Amino acid sequence: MDHAEENEIPAETQKYLVERPIFSHPVLQERLHVKDKVTDSIGDKLKQAFTCTPKKVRNIIYMFLPITKWLPAYKFKEYVLGDLVSGISTGVLQLPQGLAFAMLAAVPPVFGLYSSFYPVIMYCFFGTSRHISIGPFAVISLMIGGVAVRLVPDDIVIPGGVNATNGTEARDALRVKVAMSVTLLSGIIQFCLGVCRFGFVAIYLTEPLVRGFTTAAAVHVFTSMLKYLFGVKTKRYSGIFSVVYSTVAVLQNVKNLNVCSLGVGLMVFGLLLGGKEFNERFKEKLPAPIPLEFFAVVMGTGISAGFNLHESYSVDVVGTLPLGLLPPANPDTSLFHLVYVDAIAIAIVGFSVTISMAKTLANKHGYQVDGNQELIALGICNSIGSLFQTFSISCSLSRSLVQEGTGGKTQLAGCLASLMILLVILATGFLFESLPQAVLSAIVIVNLKGMFMQFSDLPFFWRTSKIELTIWLTTFVSSLFLGLDYGLITAVIIALLTVIYRTQSPSYTVLGQLPDTDVYIDIDAYEEVKEIPGIKIFQINAPIYYANSDLYSSALKRKTGVNPAIIMGARRKAMRKYAKEVGNANIANATVVKVDAEVDGENATKPEEEDDEVKFPPIVIKTTFPEELQRFLPQGENIHTVILDFTQVNFMDSVGVKTLAGIVKEYGDVGIYVYLAGCSAQVVNDLTSNRFFENPALKELLFHSIHDAVLGSQVREAMAEQETTVLPPQEDMEPNATPTTPEA
């Protein structure tokens, strides 16, 4: 036996013994002394807010310009090699993705290069993540393309009698203007949200929602790329059912497919799939992943130029890539009223994708990212970038994994990648003018593999949470058929409705005691758990507020089987039977107390003559009900206390407090005490502010724990038994007397 086993304490001897008073709320408060809270005056707060100290200035600079904090602490010898390798690896991937995602955005390819340069440089200064790769992203590019195609469709008539070539250029110029306007507006939205500290909005985009949305976006991207892969000419669609129209259009024109274009695309597709599998299998042995996309671009460009595929076989190619950077231009703000819905969706989706990947990599490497500053950084990248003809950017998942996986330590790796793009823009762009669009299509489709793998979420959510499965499926279906903008809005609404549903339909549990312990567990779950005679313990795992207060009251009566209306009805029957037996017509016609209560959500007040079948187990209440009438009551368990477990209730509103007050009175009218156990400070404050404790004696109903409430109930009943034994019976007790409401 090893040392650990020799010193191991048998489980049956691991016990704890506690001896203390029964803590009702007043008793516990007598033992506690509230700390004096020293609050600053308004003048002191204003003075502190407007006082300028070197430390405060430094912290503001660090917050708004994170580069001023991490760059001076840059460990050159440790970081430079990793950043160098990572920057080159990310740059060679960013080039083909920039060209390909420009096709998704419905703008000329060179604008994808601009979007891969300017925002990356700006994010290096303002971003808080050290590892994510900022630039064009398939989902955001597709959303931009949807707006551009909606406002500037393929069949738009350009005034001026231009020829086909010039007409295409004019159409593309209009689409660039639309993309710039959407980008500027989405950037302004992100910046304003960040300044107003609205970074928390990302929490409303739950993981099932984001994954369902990106999966639907992957289907949209896939269908958009098919026409380039097959080399067919089809109209580009946007809006509701656009994915269906795009697929049908490709299938209708498949007889006109370009075999050469398809062959080149499939060759690159196979090369990338096999190469990525090789990279994944040998990633531990490779110093860096093989830049397959870059090799595909070089190979595709070489084959296209060598065999003159564009002229000889009508293969569509990238076309002219003008050298040099364009001068700044003002986006057309007059389009804002046409694109604001899309801009909001793009701003939120772009931020959500960025912050989720940033947090994932930050947790892996042990540092913090600031959601509000990320919003500001993205807002600056998009709003200022739009002046230089960029379209909306976000975090690219595939590039971020490459940048982190190849040893990147800081955003200097991203800067190096953007400098490689700058080299292409200024000097070598013309080399890629012969690149077939089918190659870019294959690159995009292969990079969708990770998103399509998210279909494996379905069996996981089926096993773990049907509600999250519903969110995933509804998000996917709505985004697939309604379009990404309205699909996202629909998905957020559905996600919020599930939050309401969870609180409106919580789980209700009747608890029992594990014998000889202070442990109380679901009585239906374990055989060892037993109910305490005379006591019902009822638990809810949600707040009690206007949406579920009536359901809570009904569930309490249904699950515990203790319904005041049924109890009162049983007493009426007992009095009628007693009156019939003794022939006392005065008793039979005596006035009884009418009780308004709910049975299964309906008004349970009934006339005396009604004799409906009792739906709940017969229960006799231990009260001052006349002893000579007890034999007429149905046999059942004597219930004297109902304990409401509030340990999982985090707040109550005024409607919930009124419902609780009604429950206390309703049960009190039939002689049953209602105790509240485990109330948090917030719940006590809610009860106090809603005047639940107008009668101070009601505070005696509050107990620190379930066990305190159980012991308090048992002590109260024991004392009542002693009083009954000592005191003579009351001779003048009226048969139809109603027991008074129990007092704490």
From Swiss-Prot:
Changing A202C: reported impact? Is only accessible to the intracellular side application of thiol-reactive reagents. Is not affected by thiol-reactive reagents extracellular side application
Result after altering R399E = Fully abolishes anion-dependent electromotility-related charge movement
The impact of changing R399S is:
Does not affect anion-dependent electromotility-related charge movement. Abrogates salicylate inhibition of electromotility-related charge movement
Where does the chain bind salicylate? S398
Residues exposed to the Cytoplasmic side = 1-75, 127-137, 197-206, 277-291, 360-370, 407-410, 465, 505-744
Catalytic activity as recorded in UniProt:
2 hydrogencarbonate(in) + chloride(out) = 2 hydrogencarbonate(out) + chloride(in)
Q: What is known of its domains?
A: The STAS domain mediates dimerization, with both STAS domains latched onto each other in a domain-swapped manner. The N-terminus domain is involved in dimerization such that each N-terminus domain embraces both STAS domains. The STAS domain harbors a unique anion-binding site important for the fine regulation of the high-frequency electromotile properties. The transmembrane domain consists of 14 transmembrane segments organized a 7(+)7 inverted repeat architecture that can be divided into two main helix bundles, the ''core'' domain and the ''gate'' domain.
Species of provenance: Rattus norvegicus
Record annotation: effect of changing K233Q = Shifts the voltage-sensitivity to more negative values
Please give the residue ranges for the topological domain Extracellular. 105-108, 150-168, 231-241, 254-258, 308-332, 389-396, 432-436, 482-484
The induction field says: Up-regulated in cochlea by thyroid hormone T3, perhaps acting via thyroid hormone receptor (at protein level).
Domain STAS, chain residue ranges per copy: 525-713
- Free-text activity regulation comment from the record: Salicylate, an inhibitor of outer hair cell motility, acts as a competitive antagonist at the prestin anion-binding site.
Q: What is this protein called?
A: Prestin
> What is known to happen upon mutating S398C?
Does not affect anion-dependent electromotility-related charge movement. Strongly attenuates inhibition by oxalate of electromotility-related charge movement. Is sensible to intracellular thiol-reactive reagents
One GO MF annotation is: chloride transmembrane transporter activity
